[in-house]
Amino acid sequence: MATQVTGAGGTTTSFSNTPQANNDVFNLTEDTVVLASGSQTIIVLDVMANDQGGNAKSLFSVDDGISASTATKQYAPIDLTTQDVQATGISAWESIGGGVSIRINNGKVEMDLSGYLAAHGFASLQAMGAGDQINETFTYAIKLGNGTLSWASVSVNIQGTNDGAIITAVPGADTTVVEAGGVANGTLNDPNAHGQLIITDPDVGQDHFQAPPSLQGTYGTFTFNTTTGVWAYTLNQTLADPLTQGQPVTDTLTVKSADGTASYNIVVNITGTNDAPVAIANVNSVKEDTAPNPVSGNVLSNDTDVDNGDTHTVSAVNGSAGNVGNDLVGTYGTLHLNSDGSYSYTLDNGLASVQQLAEGATVTDVFSYT
């Protein structure tokens, strides 16, 4: 038996009382949908894949599934009695509301989501993010080999996913800095670096960066704009002072995409320079006609140098390199200062100026070194 439905034009169409079309539920993600060739917004649905009726069946019509009947409060498939498929195998687009249209194309249903996507700020299905979803329903009818129709409902649920972001560096970044050197960092070099990162993410609203947990590096400080990706770095000369001449080190800032799927290391290359050592005056004492004489010490033992591991030598005494390692006669005695900083001073007790000193009186012999 079959149920007969009379259309508006008086045409009578029979619906099979033995359901051959089966309801479909398509639970998809933006990554598992089948897209129409060349499109990012039209999906293809094989609604007849689970239908009965053999090879003689064909996709006959589609409808929005909204009943014109208010008396029964149930869907009356009157709209499905009109054949949609033309001789080309392709039907006209039919709106099912919300910016979504459907049509038959060679035995499958195409659903155009472009209107819905545009209304929600998505350029394509791939622009949907985690938590975004599309839920649509429609009905369709198949024509069986005996000429009768069978209809079913279709539910389409599409979930957005978190697509991976990509971070790249804009060419031309300055990623090198050089420590200041000389006396008290008086020889300035290049303490600044800068650049920009670009982030791309198909998901709407995800094309920006997380704020880094810290902008402080080992040798300097970064700044970073989470919207534009512009970054800068300033070397802290005090922190860099321990670096030796030519010593290479790096400071790194790791930034992440808003969704955490991508990260990028901003690496600044730092080169150390030679900071001048600081000589500190040395004092020793000797007493007239009393041991010990000579007295000794090392002038380099209390000198300082911020450069780690630097070694120092005496290069001149009283302004002359020739005095290094040789006896140098002073006012009251003789100094012998070696290049390694070791020295001895011998008071000349034979000098009248020494013997004339009263008990407790003091004089000084002063020498300079470089």
How would you label these PLM feature ranges?
Residues 165, 200, 225, 234, ...:
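Basic, gly/Ser/Thr/Pro-rich low-complexity segments located predominantly at protein N termini
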Residues 3, 83-160, 184, 215-272, ...:
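Acidic, turn/loop-rich segments in luminal/extracellular domains of secretory-pathway
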Residues 14, 156-171, 266-279:
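Long, low-complexity ectodomains and other extracytoplasmic segments of secretory-pathway proteins
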Residues 2-96, 166-215, 278-330:
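Extracellular ectodomain surface segments
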Residues 51, 144, 163, 201, ...:
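Acidic active-site catalytic centers that drive phospho-/nucleotidyl reactions
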